[in-house]
């Protein structure tokens, strides 16, 4: 139940929920409100009477003893009168509310009208400002045009006077003596005439100086052109001499080309002779060796590499170490071997030792690279040799030997040029009886070149597969 007293700071009634404090002047407030007042006020004064207050003069809490109120007996007439009074007050409040609402509506309408008026005035103001800025720009432009017009008039007046003076000077320069004297007489006497004559004299002097400078510049240009002409003639003579030298070099190059064509024809003839020699009997094997030795190696042939047809890696350092005794050249081949030693820088033949197969063998075998093949030679090794060697191996008749007879291969595998500009491997037996050529076919009138296709190895890629021209 609230106490019928209130705090002047917060305007709230005192109750038992909050503490009530008092000051020595007698005024009471909520304790929390009084503390907040002291914290925010510039000085510690009473909120109501404004006297100075100290901390010790504040009573922090007051206690009130309230008695129980007696219940009043209410009368019906009293209640009816109270109800009528309340209804009258309510109707009065409603009337006041309606009047206030009418006033509010009127004020709202007035406010809307004022807002519309303000908007229209703002639009009019914006248009006026835009018109004003446009007029200012036009005025500024007109002022600028007026200034330009004045400047143009001054420039025109100055140019007219200058043009008149220039016409008189031009007439003075181009006219004869009588005309000049007549023009001077027309000028009259006086200060202006003297000034005009002075201007004419100065102009004539400047023109004379300009003519002198132009003549000097023309002389310098003429000297420069003469020097350029002399240097151009010397350069032309140099070019002519270089042209003659180029013609001589062209002739020498044509001669070299003709000699190269002749060399090609001779190589073709050697090739034809080599192919014809392949069909000779065994006694003519020395001719084959001679042609192979006489075939020069191409010195300036730049071979290009391409990928091999197989993915197997090729060991270029692989050698064939075979305990094969060196073969003694025959008396007929001794001359060619001496020639080979003398022309070592041009000779393409290199000895490569080859392994041999030791032990008895039942049938005729070829011992190449440490592999023994009964009946037929190895296709991989046969494909690595030239045509005449393959023909000799394929057409060789293997003599039958007894099983108890043991033989060792005395063949030597050599590497040399095949006569066509490339390298190849071939077998050179110590015994010429081991290599037998194919049987000689009867010659026909029309010679046909037989091309034997080499069988590529199916097991290992060869170095020849990397080379292409």
Curated annotation (Swiss-Prot):
UniProt region (Interaction with CYLD), positions on chain: 211-469
Matches recorded under SMART domains: RING
Endpoints of the signal sequence: none
Motif PIP-box per UniProt: ranges: 460-469
Alphabetically ordered keywords of this record: Chromosome, Coiled coil, Cytoplasm, Disease variant, DNA damage, DNA repair, Dwarfism, Intellectual disability, Isopeptide bond, Metal-binding, Nucleus, Repeat, Transferase, Ubl conjugation, Ubl conjugation pathway, Zinc, Zinc-finger
UniProt-listed GO biological process terms: apoptotic process; DNA damage response; negative regulation of interferon-beta production; negative regulation of tumor necrosis factor-mediated signaling pathway; protein ubiquitination; protein-DNA covalent cross-linking repair; replication fork processing; signal transduction
Family indicated by similarity: Belongs to the TRAIP family.
Known disease link: Seckel syndrome 9: A form of Seckel syndrome, a rare autosomal recessive disorder characterized by proportionate dwarfism of prenatal onset associated with low birth weight, growth retardation, severe microcephaly with a bird-headed like appearance, and intellectual disability.
Stated role: E3 ubiquitin ligase required to protect genome stability in response to replication stress. Acts as a key regulator of interstrand cross-link repair, which takes place when both strands of duplex DNA are covalently tethered together, thereby blocking replication and transcription. Controls the choice between the two pathways of replication-coupled interstrand-cross-link repair by mediating ubiquitination of MCM7 subunit of the CMG helicase complex. Short ubiquitin chains on MCM7 promote recruitment of DNA glycosylase NEIL3.
Protein name: E3 ubiquitin-protein ligase TRAIP
Species this chain originates from: Homo sapiens
Underlying gene: TRAIP
């Amino acid at each position: 139940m609230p106490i019928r007293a209130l705090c002047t700071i917060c305007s709230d009634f005192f109750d038992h929920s909050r503490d009530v404090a008092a000051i020595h002047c007698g005024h009471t407030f909520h304790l929390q409100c009084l503390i907040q007042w002291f914290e925010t006020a510039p000085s510690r004064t009473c909120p109501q009477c404004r006297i100075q207050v100290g901390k010790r003069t504040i009573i922090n809490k007051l206690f009130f003893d309230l008695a129980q109120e007696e219940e009043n007996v209410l009368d019906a007439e009293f209640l009816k009168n109270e109800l009528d009074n309340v209804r009258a007050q309510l109707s009065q409040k409603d009337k006041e509310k309606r009047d206030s609402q009418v006033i509010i509506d009127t004020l709202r309408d007035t406010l809307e009208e004022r807002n519309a008026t303000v908007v229209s005035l703002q639009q009019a103001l914006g248009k006026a400002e835009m018109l004003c800025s446009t007029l200012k720009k036009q005025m500024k432009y007109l002022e600028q045009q007026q200034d330009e017009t004045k400047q143009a008039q001054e420039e025109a007046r100055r140019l007219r006077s200058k043009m008149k003076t220039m016409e008189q000077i031009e007439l003075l320069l181009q006219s004869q003596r009588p005309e000049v004297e007549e023009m001077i007489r027309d000028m009259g006497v006086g200060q202006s005439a003297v000034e005009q004559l002075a201007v004419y004299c100065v102009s004539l002097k400047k023109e004379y100086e300009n003519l002198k400078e132009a003549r000097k510049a023309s002389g310098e240009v003429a000297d420069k052109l003469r020097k350029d002409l002399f240097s151009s003639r010397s350069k032309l003579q140099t070019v002519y001499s270089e042209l003659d030298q180029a013609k001589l070099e062209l002739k020498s190059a044509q001669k070299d080309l003709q000699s190269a064509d002749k060399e090609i024809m001779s190589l073709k003839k050697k090739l034809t002779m080599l192919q014809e020699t392949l069909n000779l009997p065994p006694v003519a094997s020395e001719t084959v060796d001679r042609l192979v030795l006489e075939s020069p190696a191409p010195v300036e042939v730049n071979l290009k590499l391409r990928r091999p047809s197989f993915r197997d890696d090729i060991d270029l350092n692989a050698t064939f170490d075979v305990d094969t005794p060196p073969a003694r050249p025959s008396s007929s081949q001794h001359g060619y071997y001496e020639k080979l030693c003398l022309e070592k820088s041009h000779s393409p033949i290199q000895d490569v030792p080859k392994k041999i197969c030791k032990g008895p063998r039942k049938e005729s075998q070829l011992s190449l690279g440490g592999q023994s093949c009964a009946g037929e030679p190895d296709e991989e090794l046969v494909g690595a040799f030239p045509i005449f060697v393959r023909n000799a191996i394929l057409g060789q008749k293997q003599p039958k030997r007894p099983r108890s007879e043991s033989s060792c291969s005395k063949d030597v595998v050599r590497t040399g040029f095949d006569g066509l500009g490339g390298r190849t491997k071939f077998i050179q037996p110590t015994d010429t009886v081991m290599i037998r050529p194919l049987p000689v076919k009867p010659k026909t009138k029309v010679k046909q070149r037989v091309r034997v296709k080499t069988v590529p190895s199916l097991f290992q890629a060869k170095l020849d597969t990397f080379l292409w021209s």
